[in-house]
Curated annotation (Swiss-Prot):
Belongs to the FGAMS family. It catalyses: N(2)-formyl-N(1)-(5-phospho-beta-D-ribosyl)glycinamide + L-glutamine + ATP + H2O = 2-formamido-N(1)-(5-O-phospho-beta-D-ribosyl)acetamidine + L-glutamate + ADP + phosphate + H(+). It comes from Exiguobacterium sp. (strain ATCC BAA-1283 / AT1b). Mg(2+) 2 binds at residues 122, 273. This is Phosphoribosylformylglycinamidine synthase subunit PurL. The keyword DNA-binding does not apply. Coiled coil: none annotated. The gene is purL. It holds the Pfam family FGAR-AT_linker. The lineage of its organism: Bacteria, Bacillati, Bacillota, Bacilli, Bacillales. InterPro entries: PRibForGlyAmidine_synth_PurL, PurL_linker, PurM-like_C_dom, PurM-like_C_sf, PurM-like_N, PurM-like_N_sf. It is found in: Cytoplasm. Substrate binds at residues 99-102, 121, 245, 317-319, 540.
Amino acid sequence: MLLTTEPTATQIRDERIYATMGLSDDEYALVVSLLGREPNYTEIGLFSVMWSEHCSYKNSKPVLRKFPTTGKHVLQGPGEGAGIVDIGDGQAVAFKIESHNHPSAIEPYQGAATGVGGIIRDIFSMGARPIALLNSLRFGDLNESRVKHLFGHVVSGIAGYGNCVGIPTVGGEVAFDPAYSGNPLVNAMCVGFIRHEDIQKGIAEGVGNSVMYVGATTGRDGIHGATFASEELGEDADEKRPAVQVGDPFMEKLLIEACLEVIKHPALVGIQDMGAAGLTSSSAEMASKAGMGIEMNLDLVPQRETGMTPYEMMLSESQERMLLVVKAGHEDEIEAIVTKWGLHAIKVGEVIEEKVLRLVHQGEVAAEVPVDALAEDAPVYHKPSKVPAYYEAFQAMEPVTPIVEDMMATWKDVLAMPSIASKRWVYEQYDHMVQTSTVVAPGSDAAVIRIRETEKSLAMTTDCNAKYVYLDPRVGGAIAVAEAARNIVASGAEPLALTDCLNFGSPDKPEGFWQLDQAVEGMAEACRTLDTPVIGGNVSLYNESNGQAIYPTPVVGMVGLIEKPEHITTSFAKQAGDVVFLLGETKAEFGGSALQMLQDGKVSGHAPTLDLENERQTQKVLLHAIREGLVTAAHDVSEGGLAAALPELVFGTGFGVDVTIDTDLVTALFSESQSRFLVTVDKAHAEAFARMTNGTAIGTVTEASTLVVRASDRLIEMDVQELERVWEGAIPCYMTSEA
């Protein structure tokens, strides 16, 4: 809301201007109560962004408390820019995932690019050097021209920013479903490396210490971005384009280097990214955490546009900006470091004893608000919850095994589904080798980055099958955690912890809140069983377009530790003659499956079942087998079932595979039962592997590039290269065809 003349406090009240900023009548009354007076325009702007769901988690806080957040590896849990876990030898890894869904729906290139930039700043604000980027993306039906436009420009935005800033984009996931046609999801994850002694916090301690502004100038882009991210997308969505920020990755690169050098200086007290809610959130949160206040002179804020008001400066979400608190008397030393990198470093205020955020503009106090009122005293809502009618209907359904009349044609059709097909079209646009530490590039179950000058590596992944979560939020939430851990273990790593991005519809609808609550219950249970605490994350609610919500999509970003290079494992067959094992039990479970979507065009019925103790044990024995040197390749069996996992095992290798199926073929190939791995083992170790894991030997890797399935009543034989052409060509074909 950009006005030439700002409304008076009386107009704000009488014309309910606060409601256009996302505040309810009750919330406005609470602001008046906290201040002891009616707020002016700048002040109500501060409250509107800080009390948005995006900043305050006012609708999700009671739910988030269910997550386990501590563990043997956790050095920093939720509450700072990113979580941090210990990896031994005084070293640690910081990581976090965040959403940029609403901006990407309006301006896909900049929305995605600035999502990447923001998550990078969260990582280096902790003192960590960013070493890898991942993402999790959701789009609608790829036959639609608007969806193609969004998909293409989001991928370009991620690539454009990540490639220019010099951080490898090494992994992620992309899924397509009509549920996301009006509301795409763009979740960005960053991983950073740090030594224990360099860990920083966003805190404003020490009365008289200086508050310094570092980085790019402030413009009018992104004003009310946090509020925009906390409401449904309506018919007027395109008019919200000014709420989308504009990024500069080259400025970000300079900011990374400047801040990582400043962090080594003893005069630095605290540092925080000016992310959602810009100067408002960074100043209020840093002061509140320290039990202090901040006074800022807004005349000193570097501006790239003329005539900016306090309201605009405080609510701007211009990118590539950081707020520092520096010990008094050392400002010149910090400025010297920052200006060496060609950036602004300007004292704009200082820490004060009074616990207020005081903003001075042109010699007058433009706003004065208690910092706790902004940061800690935001209202928290316990929303009503109601089981949706669709869920009860699905639960009442009897499980049905689909009929497949043409097995070979159906198999190819599954491989050509955009959610299952190769994502090479996506990741070949990303520079995944910059920094030259990428050991396992996109395409395997998890990416692997080596830690230089050590034997250690990090495995990382993002995962969520939202169709399962829609069918049964509690089970689907647990499966999201379990599948992420499965991908980490299949890469030879021990899962350490996770970060989550909870993408849901409106919590104001009791059925929507029930989905959120149940999904978190399931995730929390899986986290406890698998010993993967939640160290941070993001909540993105109101993902609805014209009243239609997305599937509940709790994306899990997970990192694991590989102790030795010989433990690194990929999902690709290595040599002919290796024995192919299937770990885990296959049941007739087709609810939410690729086959169900292919045949019915929608999901229904029951989500796959999940026995968490069995999941834990299966992962444990596989990781042990990998560390014992018995495994040549390991692949999680997930979406598409064995029909996807089996050919993926040999795609790009020149090998084939010959397996025997002695159960129902449709179930064996297309069921999406959980807790399963495909594993290849040198035949010399096959007996030992079978004893250790109770795995079932189903076939061998062959020299001939042929996929052979021997069933009791038929023989299926297909050319691997032909299947690979179908799998590799699907997304490029969609993107070059006319809608």
